[in-house]
Regions:
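P-loop NTP-binding/switch modules centered on Walker-like glycine-rich loops
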Residues: 1
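Non-catalytic connector elements of ABC transporters
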Residues: 4-87
Length: 87
């Protein structure tokens, strides 16, 4: 029987995106995907409300394509979104 699973378009590279009082109520991931025309795979997300302010973080897996990964990190920098590479 033929394998019918979709091809894996994601690399092993993952980043942690931090959501603070400036970004928690914005559609950061959808804006990123639309602006960069590159998919991300959400691995984990957690948000909490502290003193009426939402904070959180999300781990996303990046595409295999190096140009797309560079576009994503450039967009995050340009939009002052805090992120770090996950090991």
């Amino acid at each position: 029987q033929k394998d019918r699973r979709a091809p894996n378009v994601f690399s092993g590279d993952r980043i942690r995106i931090v959501f603070d009082e400036h970004t928690a109520n914005k559609p950061v991931i959808s804006d990123l995907v639309l602006a960069c025309q590159a998919p991300v795979n959400i691995i984990f997300a957690d948000t909490r409300e502290v003193g009426g302010i939402v904070y959180g973080h999300m781990i996303v897996q990046l595409p295999q394509d190096e140009r797309q990964r560079e576009k994503i990190t450039a967009w995050l920098h340009a939009n002052s979104i805090t992120f770090s590479k996950e090991v």
